[in-house]
Amino acid sequence: LKLNWKLFGKIHQQIYRLSGGRLGARMGWIDVALVETIGRKTGLVRSVPIACYPYRDSIVVSASNSGKDSHPVWYLNMQANPMVTVQLGRERFRAIAEDVADDEREALWDTIAKLNKHQGEYLEKAPRKIPLVWLRREDSMH
């Protein structure tokens, strides 16, 4: 039985949102953020659960798209409009999405691959440079 990741993501997102972040904020030992972007074509709010990792004062996410040859839609949305809203557990905050600079990327990728073996596999498999995106806190929305 193959898992339908798109359906899983929609269900995960609903549980996360309805529980106020009490459920769905972790998958195993990996933190998961619910990230809202603005659709670059529609202008509508789009929400997606994304594995995240501590970075500086906030979090970083990998635009791995499971190692596919194209960037995930949420990353393209962030490129068009970098202002996002993040729910990390029970905390919500506004953030600005910024690609991690090349001089920090390699060390950060090493850390992420140790925390999540799938990300390391995606990095090896992908025929493109996988962006790491820093979701830099703009303010707190308690």
Go through the PLM ranges and name each one.
Residues L1-G9, T37-G39, M83-R92:
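N-terminal short leaders/motifs
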Residues L1-K2, D139-H142:
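Basic/polar N-terminal segments that are highly enriched at the extreme N-terminus
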Residues L1-R26:
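Extreme N-terminal tail/first-helix region
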Residues R22-L23, T42, Q119-L123:
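Short helix-to-loop capping/linker segments positioned immediately adjacent to catalytic or ligand/cofactor-binding
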Residues I30-S66:
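Short beta-strand segments
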Residues V32, K129-L132:
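Short hydrophobic/aromatic beta-strand or adjacent loop that forms the aromatic wall/cage
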Residues N65-Q119, E124-K129, E138-D139:
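Short, structured beta-strand-loop surface elements
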Residues W134-R136:
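Short, well-ordered beta-strand micro-motif
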